[in-house]
Swiss-Prot record:
Its main location: membrane. Glycans are attached at residues 125, 321, 387. InterPro entries: Cyt_P450, Cyt_P450_CS, Cyt_P450_E_grp-IV, Cyt_P450_sf. SUPFAM superfamilies: Cytochrome P450. Its cofactor is heme. GO terms for cellular component: membrane. It comes from Talaromyces variabilis (Penicillium variabile). Keywords: Glycoprotein, Heme, Iron, Membrane, Metal-binding, Monooxygenase, Oxidoreductase, Transmembrane, Transmembrane helix. Heme binds at residue 476. The chain crosses the membrane at residues 17-37. It holds the Pfam family p450. This is Cytochrome P450 monooxygenase iccF.
């Protein structure tokens, strides 16, 4: 998961947050300077400020909103890369402690009783207001199940997910083989990804219920509004701001619950059967795993529609919007790189080889698509979810780093990701989208049988130099399913559709836009699609 400002990517009414941010700066500037104690270790320098200063000037705050990429790059090169911590501005009037790369291994080795991921995101997401309780990020067993159970049944989910992708693309890209259709990419892909993700979360037919899907996005957007606006407020005002800005999420939660309830009641009845009963066909989705787990471990939650629905919403929050933005960037990058790298033809050739046996998708088959893998990985490298990663909260008193820095209890910190992934000392020509950057290296490392090497260079691998999924034991457990989803998605699109930029783009990918520390594809980016008369 990414920093708070990343949530801007899904907020439709930018003037709202801009107005609120301006108001925050005016109303709370003196409060933060004179009344709010620093939440970072004393003595850590503030980027672009004189030594010893403990607050950011209006000039530096303004740079965060108007030129954050260069501000954070400056902080990375001057401090983080050299093994030194630094404090940078955050959303609202936040102070963000950035740990140096040299401490990443130490942080990853700390127990959850000392440094917590869950507590960090509980602070950031403020679900106490948007979902009515802290349990959904305080006791995240709905996410733990992805790691402990869902990934082990991934092979059983792949066929249904593939079928749903076909249905969704046929509906939204169309089936006209004669005429080009211009689509607004993000708007269309939000619907496709929501439907596909819901197939493995709650199954069919609820995954095709437009009212249910729209309400889920309403909750997600409301959650992000709450996180941004509430965190931009002083703590004494948060109990007032939180409920006010959470009305959208709460109202949409009620719609989700209403649409979800018939399936919920139906699934409770299935629990009367043993899942291994040969006369009973166990549903294969996240919801069923969740309910089976609750029977044994969360009996107090099992029959509570409100709690189970909101745990499903939490899963949707993690599985929908970031995947959508990645696929938007990926399709734009493929088209933008096609003239130089012949990207589409190379991918279609690999897809044809992979699917020519006519057999269904399997995890093993998807793993052989190293060029498609490279295209996805390069998108995540050059267009990460946010500028920072590995959000953590200190929950142990007296924690001291190996270099002697005392970390205050309840302080938050993170690591740079975007500057690392664009570091010329780590990547050749780092700002260039090179679709086959990693596949060339993996093919060069192939063994005598021609099997590719470089398994540390796959989409789902993590390292200090590649952080879209986080790193270490808390790396995103859903990345294996998302990996399969994106490869099947891309195969279906390129096998069944011709795609191109609108004429006015002149063959050029529209440039990334920056909202504070978040790089996004331009609002309203479009492509043209036409169904192929014959699939490859």
């Amino acid at each position: 998961m990414a920093p708070l400002a990343t949530y801007l990517s899904q907020i439709d009414d930018y003037p709202k947050w801009a107005l609120f941010t301006g108001g925050s700066i005016v109303l709370f500037f003196l409060y933060r300077i004179f009344l709010s104690p620093p939440s970072y270790p004393p003595g850590v320098p503030l980027i672009a400020e004189p030594a010893g200063r403990t607050w950011f000037s209006p000039k530096t705050r303004w740079r965060y909103y108007t030129d954050c990429a260069s501000l954070y790059l400056e902080a990375y090169n001057q401090y983080s890369k050299k093994g030194k911590p630094v404090v940078v501005p955050g959303f609202g009037l936040g102070y963000e402690l950035i740990m140096p790369e040299s401490l990443m291994s130490w942080v990853m080795a700390q127990p959850d009783s000392a440094i917590s991921v869950n507590q960090a995101f509980l602070d950031i997401n403020k679900t106490k207001y948007s979902l009515g309780h802290t349990r959904y990020w305080g006791d995240t067993w709905q996410f733990v199940l992805v790691k402990t159970q869902l990934n082990s049944v991934l092979q059983y989910l792949i066929p249904g997910l593939n079928d749903e992708l076909k249905l969704a693309f046929d509906a939204h890209f169309g089936t006209d083989t004669e005429n080009w259709k211009e689509i607004e990419l993000e708007k269309v892909l939000k619907n496709v990804i929501a439907q596909a993700a819901s197939r493995f979360i709650v199954g069919a037919p609820l995954c095709r219920n437009e009212k249910y899907l729209k309400a889920n996005y309403g909750v997600i957007e409301g959650m992000m509004l709450n996180a941004i606006f509430t965190n931009s407020s002083p703590k004494w005002l948060q109990p007032i701001i939180g409920p006010l800005v959470s009305k959208k999420s709460i109202n949409n939660c009620e719609i989700v619950k209403k649409e979800f309830e018939p399936l919920f009641r139906e699934r409770l009845e299935t629990l009367k059967h043993d899942k291994d009963d040969p006369n009973f066909e166990e549903p294969q989705d996240h919801l069923q795993l969740l309910l089976r787990y609750a029977v044994k471990e969360r009996k107090d939650e099992l029959n509570d529609l409100d709690i189970i629905a909101k745990r499903i919403i939490a899963v949707n929050f993690a599985s929908m919007n970031q995947t959508t933005m990645t696929v938007v960037n990926m399709l734009l990058n493929i088209l933008g790189s096609d003239a130089e790298f012949n990207t589409i033809a190379v991918l279609r050739d690999e897809m044809k080889r992979t699917t020519s046996d006519g057999e269904p998708w399997t995890k093993a088959k998807l793993a052989t698509m190293i060029r498609t893998d490279s295209v996805v990985r390069e998108t995540l490298r050059i267009n990460p979810f946010g500028n920072r990663s590995l959000m953590r909260k200190v929950i142990k008193e007296g924690l001291v780093t190996p270099d002697g820095m005392k970390l205050p209890k309840n302080s938050l910190f993170s690591f740079f990701s975007e500057p690392v992934q664009h570091d010329p000392d780590k990547f050749e020509d780092p700002f260039k989208y090179d679709p086959f950057r990693t596949s060339r290296e993996r093919e060069a490392a192939a063994d005598e049988e021609g099997k590719p090497g470089g398994h540390a260079l796959t989409v789902v691998s993590t390292s200090p130099n590649y952080l879209p999924w986080g790193h270490g034991k808390h790396a995103c457990p859903g990345r294996f399913l998302v990996d399969c989803e994106m490869k099947m998605l891309l195969t279906y699109v390129l096998s069944n559709y011709d795609i191109e930029f609108p004429v006015e783009y002149n063959g050029q990918r529209p440039p990334t836009i920056w909202l504070a520390e978040v790089g996004l594809p331009p609002r309203g980016a479009k492509i043209r699609v036409k169904r192929r008369k014959e699939a490859i």
